[in-house]
Amino acid sequence: MKLRYVVVTSVTRDDLPDGGAAHWAETVRAIRKQNPDAAIELLIPDLDARPDLLDTVIASKPDIIGHNIETVERLTPVVRSRAKYRTSLETLRHMSRQGVATKSGLMVGLGESDDEVLQTLHDLREAGVGIVTLGQ
């Protein structure tokens, strides 16, 4: 399949001891074996911001790793009942500090203020995120 750009996503796998980190890494290696020149982007859960799990994924050398912040801090408990805003930022910060191109997504139109959106964008930038997508 001569793929040039591959985006891999999944649901959160809290049912697995490593949150799926080993599977993410193996998936990247398998794609590289079949398509060595393909750019690979992952969209991963926060893996509880555990450096050991994040480093497992990072070591597989995807080109971009994304983790979506999804919403502003105030709305996180409502929009992402099992997630924590600060844990997402720590996840992104760790990946960025390891030199990985880091991406996050933010939904708008959920009742957030302009100032809250700007604060979230500032928080993402402070965490080292270089790519942000906005959706509705």
Name every feature range the model reports, one short phrase each.
Residues 1-6, 10-135:
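Conserved AdoMet/S-adenosylmethionine-binding subsite of the radical SAM
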